[in-house]
């Protein structure tokens, strides 16, 4: 809000109706993002906490790394992170779970410890976040509201992009590891006692992976079967359409069912359910409020006269909506240092125009969805 107020002062002076812009513009954008995505953030955070408490996430990561072994340490960590995040486990939980496993494997394979962050990031923060069809990550969910799509939008583009990200990422990490070995650099003399983890008494892999299968199958069923065959005209009373909300509803239902499944199958193991739910809900607040604050700031920018200049510049880059969208989403995500917040700002301001342009060129809204999602994972990782 402070940056929004400063922006108003810089562009309109002290006659810019600061409080009106704060309560009616900034807070409207802020609250609207929460209205649209709080259920997703909350259910997803609870799911991540339940997967952690039931040791399902640890079991999946341990199973993959054991099967691939130390000779394929980098690939093992990448695939573990990919499967967990594709299943809906939050990025932060995945990093926490994978770090001790990666440390153990890298030490055995004598791979530099400094490559662990990049290895975890490739599996957890790249193709499953923005590219892989069906991913419940928020960066793949936000475009649905604007383009009337679902999480499986443009599957071929998504799969091709995923393969490219995985392949190029693995090539780079492997090259760095080999280069380090040639230079005589190994894991190093690091004391890792503090990150030792007990992997005994983990649940079997079938039980651990079932919640992820439930999310995928349920999301697919509701997105492609159930909501495709019902009459959504009643939603006109609520000022929306079925195509705008069905994708989000499908993901919410899928995650809730997975949450319920974990609880019911771990009644003896999960001792304090209320505490776990409290922590899960609390964990959802920070990323939700951060993204909402950024989107609120975007609402203020959109209301200013200078936005017309920005909009003209963006659309002047290319008359092709795909190219223009890719550049604008990347740019705004880079400026805000947030994939979800920048994506929300971009699409809230520009999606209607892109949709109109794509219709004139006979471009499917699914392609716009996938390009927007992919672009959100670009410049958001700049050092700032």
Regions flagged by a language model, labelled:
Residues 1, 34-37, 48-58, 85-97, ...:
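Short helix-coil transition sites and intra-membrane helix breaks within transmembrane domains
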Residues 4-13, 41-46, 80-85, 123-127, ...:
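Hydrophobic core segments of alpha-helical transmembrane domains in multi-pass membrane transport
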Residues 31-38, 64-79, 109-116, 153, ...:
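Membrane-interfacial loop-to-helix junctions in multi-pass transporters
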């Amino acid at each position: 809000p402070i940056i929004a107020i400063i922006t108003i002062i810089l562009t309109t002076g002290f006659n810019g109706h600061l409080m009106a812009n704060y309560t009616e513009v900034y807070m409207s954008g802020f609250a609207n993002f929460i209205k649209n995505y709080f259920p997703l953030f909350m259910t997803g955070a609870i799911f991540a906490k339940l997967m952690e408490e039931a040791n399902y996430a640890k079991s999946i990561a341990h199973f993959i790394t054991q099967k691939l072994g130390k000779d394929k340490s980098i690939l093992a960590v990448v695939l573990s992170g990919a499967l967990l995040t594709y299943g809906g486990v939050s990025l932060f939980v995945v990093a926490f779970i994978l770090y001790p496993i990666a440390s153990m494997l890298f030490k055995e394979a004598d791979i530099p410890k400094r490559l662990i962050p990049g290895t975890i990031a490739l599996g957890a923060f790249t193709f499953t976040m923005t590219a892989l069809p069906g991913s419940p990550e928020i960066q793949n969910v936000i475009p649905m509201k604007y383009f009337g799509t679902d999480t499986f939008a443009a599957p071929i583009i998504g799969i091709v992009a995923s393969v490219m990200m995985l392949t190029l990422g693995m090539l780079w990490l492997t090259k760095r590891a080999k280069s380090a070995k040639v230079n005589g650099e190994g894991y190093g003399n690091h004391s890792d006692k503090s990150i030792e983890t007990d992997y005994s008494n983990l649940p079997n892999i079938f039980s651990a992976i079932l919640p992820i299968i439930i999310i995928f199958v349920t999301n697919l069923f509701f997105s492609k079967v159930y909501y495709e065959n019902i009459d959504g005209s009643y939603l006109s009373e609520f000022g929306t359409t079925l195509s705008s909300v069905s994708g989000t509803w499908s993901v919410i239902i899928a995650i809730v069912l997975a949450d319920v499944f974990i609880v019911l199958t771990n009644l003896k193991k999960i001792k304090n359910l209320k505490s776990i739910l409290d922590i899960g809900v609390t964990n959802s607040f920070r990323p939700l409020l951060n993204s909402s604050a950024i989107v609120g700031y975007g609402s203020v920018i959109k209301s200013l006269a200078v936005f017309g200049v920005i909009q003209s510049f963006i659309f002047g880059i290319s008359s092709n909506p795909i190219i223009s969208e890719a550049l604008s989403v990347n740019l705004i995500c880079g400026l805000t240092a947030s994939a979800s917040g920048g994506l929300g700002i971009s699409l809230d301001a520009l999606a209607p125009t892109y949709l109109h342009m794509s219709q004139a060129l006979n471009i499917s809204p699914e392609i716009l969805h996938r390009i927007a999602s992919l672009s959100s994972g670009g410049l958001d990782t700049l050092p700032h």
